[in-house]
């Protein structure tokens, strides 16, 4: 995906050295693919962890933490040209927190939409897919318009901040209406 493109255009020399020295991989595209796969793996494998955290702390508190972390890391990525190893770690953490946020969202869904859970999971999955596509396009636009990814990371941080504000606007109503009826942690 686009993470490979980002890594290739920003850290090609570092990835080439890492690929040859550590992985014995002469093809830098393969090395970039490994790093992209590692970050995607973090997002996928940690979804249940996010759900478990939301079961303990509540979905809203969990989303605040996960989205807050993503927002902060996106701001850091927009503000600084990070060294290669730190950039990989930051991307890993962004994807891990997005995956855990997914688990937290699905902790809330059955409480709010118990009778319509099938359609709601479909709608939420669709929104996630469209959001991922929009993110890719935003990074592509950023690279084309500004020859870098700063604007893409900044827009990503703004969108995540808007999500945090959206949660803040509805949390009291959620807790005093369906949250009480559901009996779960929201």
Report each predicted region and the residues it spans:
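Interfacial helix-cap and linker-helix signal at transmembrane-aqueous boundaries
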Residues: 7-8, 53-54, 138-147
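A membrane-interface helix-boundary motif in multi-pass transporters
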Residues: 141-159
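Intracellular juxtamembrane helix-capping segments at the cytosolic ends
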Residues: 100-113
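Extracytoplasmic gate region of multi-pass secondary transporters
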Residues: 1-45
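Helix-to-loop junctions at the C-terminal end of transmembrane segments
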Residues: 46-58
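Cytoplasmic membrane-interface "Motif A"-like loop-to-helix N-cap segments
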Residues: 55-67
């Amino acid at each position: 995906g686009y993470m490979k493109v980002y890594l290739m255009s920003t850290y090609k020399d570092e990835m080439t050295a890492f690929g040859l020295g550590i992985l014995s991989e002469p093809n830098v595209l393969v090395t970039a693919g490994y790093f992209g796969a590692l970050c995607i793996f973090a997002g996928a494998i940690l979804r249940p962890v996010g759900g478990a955290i939301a079961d303990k702390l509540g979905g809203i508190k969990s989303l605040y933490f996960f989205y807050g972390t993503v927002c902060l890391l996106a701001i850091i990525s927009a503000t600084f040209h990070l060294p290669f190893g730190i950039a990989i770690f930051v991307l890993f953490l962004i994807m891990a927190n997005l995956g855990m946020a997914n688990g937290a969202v699905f902790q809330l869904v059955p409480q709010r939409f118990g009778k319509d859970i099938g359609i709601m999971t479909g709608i939420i999955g669709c929104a996630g897919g469209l959001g991922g596509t929009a993110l890719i396009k935003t990074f592509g636009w950023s690279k084309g318009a500004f020859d870098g990814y700063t604007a893409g990371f900044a827009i990503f941080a703004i969108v995540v901040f808007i999500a945090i504000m959206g949660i803040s606007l509805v949390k009291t109503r959620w807790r005093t209406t369906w949250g009480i009826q559901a009996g779960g942690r929201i």
